[in-house]
Amino acid sequence: MSEAPRFFVGPEDTEINPGNYRHFFHHADEDDEEEDDSPPERQIVVGICSMAKKSKSKPMKEILERVSLFKYITVVVFEEEVILNEPVENWPLCDCLISFHSKGFPLDKAVAYAKLRNPFVINDLNMQYLIQDRREVYSILQAEGILLPRYAILNRDPNNPKECNLIEGEDHVEVNGEVFQKPFVEKPVSAEDHNVYIYYPTSAGGGSQRLFRKIGSRSSVYSPESNVRKTGSYIYEEFMPTDGTDVKVYTVGPDYAHAEARKSPALDGKVERDSEGKEVRYPVILNAREKLIAWKVCLAFKQTVCGFDLLRANGQSYVCDVNGFSFVKNSMKYYDDCAKILGNIVMRELAPQFHIPWSIPLEAEDIPIVPTTSGTMMELRCVIAVIRHGDRTPKQKMKMEVRHQKFFDLFEKCDGYKSGKLKLKKPKQLQEVLDIARQLLMELGQNNDSEIEENKPKLEQLKTVLEMYGHFFSGINRKVQLTYLPHGCPKTSSEEEDSRREEPSLLLVLKWGGELTPAGRVQAEELGRAFRCMYPGGQGDYAGFPGCGLLRLHSTYRHDLKIYASDEGRVQMTAAAFAKGLLALEGELTPILVQMVKSANMNGLLDSDSDSLSSCQQRVKARLHEILQKDRDFTAEDYEELTPSGSVSLIKSMHLIKNPVKTCDKVYSLIQSLTSQIRHRMEDPKSSDIQLYHSETLELMLRRWSKLEKDFKAKNGRYDISKIPDIYDCIKYDVQHNGSLKLENTMELYRLSKALADIVIPQEYGITKAEKLEIAKGYCTPLVRKIRSDLQRTQDDGTVNKLHPVYSRGVLSPERHVRTRLYFTSESHVHSLLSILRYGALCNESKDEQWKRAMDYLNVVNELNYMTQIVIMLYEDPNKDLSSEERFHVELHFSPGAKGCEEDKNLPSGYGYRPASRENEGRRPSKIDNDDEPHTSKRDEVDRAVILFKPMVSEPIHIHRKSPLPRSRKMATNDEESPLSVSSPEGTGTWLHYTSGVGTGRRRRRSGEQITSSPVSPKSLAFTSSIFGSWQQVVSENANYLRTPRTLVEQKQNPTVGSHCAGLFSTSVLGGSSSAPNLQDYARTHRKKLTSSGCIDDATRGSAVKRFSISFARHPTNGFELYSMVPSICPLETLHNALSLKQVDEFLASIASPSSDVPRKTAEISSTALHSSPIMRKKVSLNTYTPAKILPTPPATLKSTKASSKPATSGPSSAVVPNTSSRKKNITSKTETHEHKKNTGKKK
């Protein structure tokens, strides 16, 4: 055939039902049967030439069945045997050829066939050679002006691999002069080689993630190997931070592109599969820029059907891979569209006389969304949480003056003289310090140089600390600071005059400890898992566990999630562990940290420079120390001076202490007793080499306490009050984690040091309200500005990443967008933010009963422990007028974090999670106002009664820790005793009550000592009602099975209200977090040990069981550690649930404003990115259009509106009925960095 045929068909225009056509797969056998039924015109033959695995795949069959419904098209599939073994002359004839390369396909023969027969070719064959080489692909993309990650190509000669332009550093590589800092990506140049490696920086834990073609349920694996490959040619490229999701785009011609989101294989390597075992993917809408990219890719590579990978990062879209011919799997709509477009392309090319129009399927935007329900609905739009890091090892510090030339050489080598200061964190740098310490100690052994001799104990400690954890340095654990002192250390009066002290020296400060413990990881991961349940669920089964609503939102790009952390290792690891729980990830924290956690230290958002502490804070510390140095009982003046805010917890601590100096004497003698006990243990050969929690030895524990003993009391007998937080830190750690040592009087030391710390720690952030506010602003102003911008919608609708509603049948709310901003930080920021909320005049206590109750609760809270959370949630009521102040609604929640080691009765309890709002309180409904909502009104009335007649106590509900065991191993059977059912001898409470299985959707009950599991319908959990309503239901059902008399009596009598405040964050961290198969046996064997550690004497054993979970955390180097208690986390308490956005915005503006003038009106209050939530007020509204600007209503109108309208914020919600409104909303997600600059840079 010299040229492509053109078919001219006669005027016959008979209507033929395409459904009557048989599907053409093996046409040769059917020719005779079909002859009479076929139209008289010659058919256009479309030939499919590919390997059998591809041509017989489900997507190909689905599409070919549809293509063969075209009246004039016949499909012929070339058999694999013919393709491989027959010469091209014997291949079937066709008019149009669809042929593509895959493993084992003879592309040369296909090219020869096309040359011989000259058919119309759908996917250009010569370009398929280029697609197999990533270098060529990148070159074409670059020529087309398509954005690519920054990259460099390393070509190696296979015969001489060592000769290449590659210089490898500890945390970077240099390729042809181009430097790539870790994390970076290493891709083989052959596109057929899927072994792509991502290398992580040592600061995040080092190692690499190795990606490969899916094998079962894995697509990548983490490796500790940090060095790049030494053979083969590679492309090195910058790693793009995509928040853990990739987009795969499939074109059919230049004008059609279908896009799907899936979890990035680099995140944890676990392939998410649905109930049919297929990888979970979600269709997303491409923005205009991405559609242009698809158009360019399709035309540049001359591939009509073409797949490529997009990375959405930094507000841009980058192409990182072009795969050539590929179809979408499992989308009927795509199959219809693809067949229609391919058929039209063929007809237009080979039968132009039909004038086939360009028929592109309707865009998503053109499809109307039909509303399904009506009524009052509150829709969660935004969740902002500020969270303290998890349980950590005690922070330790050692200072020494060094004068040896080797230290000066190191200081000079690292450019220390530029600023006079140097911070060494990298393994290579720490190794150099260790080498110097070893060398000096060796010299000391050989001769007595008096200058070095002076520092011998400190040099030994320096060496010991740097040698901890074996040879591998993790930059997260330790750091050395060197400061240049031109005249040596300042002299103290007791020092002899010494001319040498005038010479320059270096102050070496070694900091170590303060790492997140395995218990801290468990806490963070569990809290993340519990946070999931704040988001309403979609229909269908995502992965068979609760909180799937959030996971669906996230993987479909409808969850605009950003996680920020300060630059401390423990904070970053807490954020990564939280993300792991929140997004149901598996594996190591390093890949999660690198991809999901943004460091916020660039703009001072979450970090603070201790050198720049305000003079106010210095004054406060001095006054505090002065008061606590007086050797007398506290007087009325002391109470007045120390507790002007009237804090109940402070007054309680002062009552306990009475005389601060006498209490310090007791603490000092208890520390002396402790150090002597540890020395005694070290002398005992049985326990000399005992391993304590987290690899600590008795020797290190002794050094820790000896240093405190030495530093706490000066030679003149005065106490250093600044050491009290450190003493409390250490004893709390040992009580929780080293209880097995059974050291005497630890609980007494804990009690006294806690009482002192409860005064010192909060009061260091200001004694009077004015001081607290001033110090808080110093720490928190950038964060307050950022929170304010998070609550406003400042992005442009055009850049939105949206789910494609047409393709997403199983998704309830295709246009729902939700914004979550999580800020992980240290104690200082949490104290400061809480001070701002308490003392910054957000509400008036005298006029607002709910706020007064919240302040009373906060006055009782004595410690903001690990995992403290401050949560702000923004709702929208789409039924309210756009200009109404009631359209946007803000709620404020708080949890003081992990419980301490004291009895439960000492724990403060607030009024619960989401108690009835203030407006609802004074109003008893005489009749049901709305026939549609009888249950809601009833429930509101119950809430009102509870608030008026009974204080609400939030009882913890444990979220079951998801064990990595296979499903069959996870369930405790009747004959297998679960470690969770350990009951206290006194019968004062059992673990069982606290692990009522709500989080796993299973009900647990007690029968003797056994646990049986019975499923709770998912409907009662997260799918048709808000998670909280359903938790009430499950808890009340559970009430019949729980045999814990004391707890039940103390709980509210009314089962309906049973746990309406327990909610999400009544999630004490669940124990039994082991991944070891023999846990049950271990718990049975060690039952006695588990319930009576050294820190819990017999009298408090029962309550201890409730306060803690047992964590059998596996340590990377030491196998199983000694068992350790993981403290439960206090439930979230509602501080206020009836704030308007206008009120909150003006408050935040006044705090963030540098001047004292507070603008009375904000120029615009925009709605925020939607967030799915734990509790929807009444019914959840979806798909509302949110205007870019909402002008504040004039005050007069507001009053009347408020008076006339029913508040939508009372009590727990009734069942949530998803709704689809006809109005659309377009919520956007521009880059967060831009968002921050934009909002901090301008004042509203």
UniProtKB/Swiss-Prot annotation:
<feature type="modified residue" description="Phosphoserine">
    <location>
        <position position="1221"/>
    </location>
</feature>
<dbReference type="Pfam" id="PF18086">
    <property type="entry name" value="PPIP5K2_N"/>
</dbReference>
<feature type="modified residue" description="Phosphoserine">
    <location>
        <position position="1075"/>
    </location>
</feature>
<keyword id="KW-0547">Nucleotide-binding</keyword>
<feature type="region of interest" description="Polyphosphoinositide-binding domain">
    <location>
        <begin position="371"/>
        <end position="442"/>
    </location>
</feature>
<feature type="binding site">
    <location>
        <position position="248"/>
    </location>
    <ligand>
        <name>substrate</name>
    </ligand>
</feature>
<feature type="binding site">
    <location>
        <position position="213"/>
    </location>
    <ligand>
        <name>ATP</name>
    </ligand>
</feature>
<feature type="compositionally biased region" description="Basic residues">
    <location>
        <begin position="961"/>
        <end position="970"/>
    </location>
</feature>
<feature type="binding site">
    <location>
        <position position="262"/>
    </location>
    <ligand>
        <name>substrate</name>
    </ligand>
</feature>
<keyword id="KW-0808">Transferase</keyword>
<feature type="region of interest" description="Disordered">
    <location>
        <begin position="899"/>
        <end position="942"/>
    </location>
</feature>
<feature type="compositionally biased region" description="Polar residues">
    <location>
        <begin position="1211"/>
        <end position="1221"/>
    </location>
</feature>
<dbReference type="InterPro" id="IPR037446">
    <property type="entry name" value="His_Pase_VIP1"/>
</dbReference>
<feature type="compositionally biased region" description="Low complexity">
    <location>
        <begin position="1196"/>
        <end position="1210"/>
    </location>
</feature>
<feature type="region of interest" description="Disordered">
    <location>
        <begin position="961"/>
        <end position="1017"/>
    </location>
</feature>
<feature type="binding site">
    <location>
        <position position="134"/>
    </location>
    <ligand>
        <name>ATP</name>
    </ligand>
</feature>
<feature type="region of interest" description="Disordered">
    <location>
        <begin position="1187"/>
        <end position="1244"/>
    </location>
</feature>
<dbReference type="GO" id="GO:0000827">
    <property type="term" value="F:inositol-1,3,4,5,6-pentakisphosphate kinase activity"/>
</dbReference>
<dbReference type="InterPro" id="IPR040557">
    <property type="entry name" value="VIP1_N"/>
</dbReference>
<comment type="function">
    <text>Bifunctional inositol kinase that acts in concert with the IP6K kinases IP6K1, IP6K2 and IP6K3 to synthesize the diphosphate group-containing inositol pyrophosphates diphosphoinositol pentakisphosphate, PP-InsP5, and bis-diphosphoinositol tetrakisphosphate, (PP)2-InsP4. PP-InsP5 and (PP)2-InsP4, also respectively called InsP7 and InsP8, regulate a variety of cellular processes, including apoptosis, vesicle trafficking, cytoskeletal dynamics, exocytosis, insulin signaling and neutrophil activation.</text>
</comment>
<feature type="modified residue" description="Phosphoserine">
    <location>
        <position position="1092"/>
    </location>
</feature>
<feature type="modified residue" description="Phosphoserine">
    <location>
        <position position="1007"/>
    </location>
</feature>
<keyword id="KW-0418">Kinase</keyword>
<comment type="similarity">
    <text>Belongs to the histidine acid phosphatase family. VIP1 subfamily.</text>
</comment>
<feature type="binding site">
    <location>
        <begin position="321"/>
        <end position="323"/>
    </location>
    <ligand>
        <name>ATP</name>
    </ligand>
</feature>
<feature type="binding site">
    <location>
        <position position="264"/>
    </location>
    <ligand>
        <name>ATP</name>
    </ligand>
</feature>
<feature type="binding site">
    <location>
        <position position="194"/>
    </location>
    <ligand>
        <name>ATP</name>
    </ligand>
</feature>
<dbReference type="GO" id="GO:0005829">
    <property type="term" value="C:cytosol"/>
</dbReference>
<feature type="binding site">
    <location>
        <position position="187"/>
    </location>
    <ligand>
        <name>ATP</name>
    </ligand>
</feature>
<feature type="binding site">
    <location>
        <position position="309"/>
    </location>
    <ligand>
        <name>ATP</name>
    </ligand>
</feature>
<keyword id="KW-0963">Cytoplasm</keyword>
<dbReference type="InterPro" id="IPR029033">
    <property type="entry name" value="His_PPase_superfam"/>
</dbReference>
<dbReference type="InterPro" id="IPR033379">
    <property type="entry name" value="Acid_Pase_AS"/>
</dbReference>
<feature type="modified residue" description="Phosphoserine">
    <location>
        <position position="1173"/>
    </location>
</feature>
<dbReference type="GO" id="GO:0052723">
    <property type="term" value="F:inositol hexakisphosphate 1-kinase activity"/>
</dbReference>
<dbReference type="Pfam" id="PF00328">
    <property type="entry name" value="His_Phos_2"/>
</dbReference>
<feature type="binding site">
    <location>
        <begin position="53"/>
        <end position="54"/>
    </location>
    <ligand>
        <name>substrate</name>
    </ligand>
</feature>
<feature type="modified residue" description="Phosphoserine">
    <location>
        <position position="1222"/>
    </location>
</feature>
<feature type="modified residue" description="Phosphoserine">
    <location>
        <position position="1166"/>
    </location>
</feature>
<feature type="binding site">
    <location>
        <begin position="246"/>
        <end position="248"/>
    </location>
    <ligand>
        <name>ATP</name>
    </ligand>
</feature>
<keyword id="KW-0597">Phosphoprotein</keyword>
<dbReference type="GO" id="GO:0000832">
    <property type="term" value="F:inositol hexakisphosphate 5-kinase activity"/>
</dbReference>
